[in-house]
Amino acid sequence: MIKNDQELNVTLDRVRQFQLQVANLRHVERNPANYRLSASGYLAELDRMTLEIREYLWSHPTETPSEAVA
C-alpha cells in the first residue's frame, strides 16, 4: 500500500520500468508462447501496482486510503 507521495513516485518509476521491459520483450522474443510466459509476471505486477496507485490517488490527503474506499 502506498502511504505517501514519495512512495507514489517510486511506484510510478517502477511502473515505467516494467512497461519498458515488456515493450523490449515484445521486440526481442520471437516465439509468441515464450513472450507470453516472460511477460505475464511483469503484466501481473503492473496490474497490482496500478491498483495501488489508483487507491492512493483516490484518497484525499486528509484521509488514509482505507478511509477513502467507497
PLM regions and their residue ranges:
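Short, charge/polar-rich alpha-helical segments
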Residues: 1-13
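Non-transmembrane amphipathic alpha-helical segments
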Residues: 11, 15-26, 49, 53-56
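Short, charge-rich amphipathic interface segments used for partner binding and complex assembly
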Residues: 33-62
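Long amphipathic alpha-helical coiled-coil segments
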Residues: 60-70
